Amino acid sequence: LIEVKNFGRAIDPAKDIAAFFEVKKMAAEIKPDVIHLHSSKAGVIGRVAFNGEIPMFYTPHGYSFLMENYKPMKRRMFKLIESVCAKRNCMTISCSVGEHQESLKLTKHATYVNNGINMAELQEIIDKTEKVEHPFTVYTLGRICYQKNPTLFNEIAESLPDVKFVWIGDGELRDQLTSENIEITGWADRSTAIRYAVNAD
């Protein structure tokens, strides 16, 4: 794992340009056979940096221009950027049917691969997990962000004070989970997350 020191989620022109040259330098040293870009920010930087030089795949994990928490002008700007980058020499791989449909509006070089679950591994972890006595427990798993609607999760928890709520994960909106019956586990590896889930209802 190699950190791109100048890479961040927020748009920062100075850091984004620095990240562009940083990944170019890394690629020159590593000489990868294939590059797989994840999320919009990496997708833009990577597709601009390596167009045609190295075979590339791009997985959006949710297009920024579809996020309703952004103002319309910002969403239009994000869509324009995606439209320009979609013309680069890259295959877009979507993880859902809806995302794939959006990808096809931008480029014909798109395919869809559903999220997969290793059922044998999952069952093995479940079988090894001790079931413990617990109050009625509701859980969710993922990053605490706008798309996951932590405000609604908090409202439901407040309306059911006798029920335990567990959020497996962490994120920038964790401060919105204020109800006393909510436990935030923080980021957990797969085995730990499954063990939390097994002891929920």
PLM feature spans:
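Acidic anion/phosphate-binding donor-loop and adjacent secondary structure
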Residues: 11-15, 104, 116-135, 145, ...
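Membrane-proximal helix-turn-helix segments that form the acceptor-binding/catalytic region
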Residues: 21-25, 75-93
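A short, histidine- and acid-enriched strand-loop-helix "catalytic/donor-clamping" loop
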Residues: 7-11, 54-74, 88-91
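Acidic donor-binding loop of glycosyltransferase active sites
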Residues: 198-201
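Donor nucleotide-sugar binding/catalytic pocket of nucleotide-sugar-dependent glycosyltransferases
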Residues: 2-3, 83-126, 137
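Nucleotide-activated donor-binding/catalytic signature segment of Leloir-type glycosyltransferases, i.e.
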Residues: 175-194
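Short His-centered aromatic/hydrophobic patch
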Residues: 37-43, 60
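Conserved donor-binding/catalytic core segment of Leloir-type glycosyltransferases
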Residues: 131-148, 154-158, 165-166
